[in-house]
Amino acid sequence: MSLEILEQLEAKVQMAVDTIALLQMEVEELKETNAALTQDLEQANNGRSEVEQEAQRARDEQAQFEARIRGLLGKMDEVE
């Protein structure tokens, strides 16, 4: 009888060990996924920053262009 109980206990312990091993593997996979997603997020943020800088340069260029056009229009008004 006690041998039977010991075998049942051994089976439960083995099942627990197997479950722990599987959970450890899952944790490692999740860590790898998290690292990859973190890297993707950093790249996306860097790309966003570059796009924002490019947009600001375009706005600055447009403002300069508009100022030059206003200056030229002002000179044309003076000529007329």
Curated annotation (Swiss-Prot):
Top-level division of the source organism's lineage: Bacteria
Cellular component per GO, a single term: cytoplasm
InterPro entries with a match to the protein in the record: Cell_div_ZapB
Amino acid composition bias (Basic and acidic residues), ranges on this chain: 49-60
Main location: cytoplasm
Biological role: Non-essential, abundant cell division factor that is required for proper Z-ring formation. It is recruited early to the divisome by direct interaction with FtsZ, stimulating Z-ring assembly and thereby promoting cell division earlier in the cell cycle. Its recruitment to the Z-ring requires functional FtsA or ZipA.
Sequence segments annotated as region (Disordered): 41-60
Pfam families assigned: ZapB
Stated family: Belongs to the ZapB family.
Compartments (UniProt record): Cytoplasm
Gene this protein is translated from: zapB
Coiled coil: 3-80
Keyword annotations of the record: Cell cycle, Cell division, Coiled coil, Cytoplasm, Septation
Subunit structure: Homodimer. The ends of the coiled-coil dimer bind to each other, forming polymers. Interacts with FtsZ.
BP-aspect Gene Ontology terms: division septum assembly; FtsZ-dependent cytokinesis
Protein name per UniProt: Cell division protein ZapB
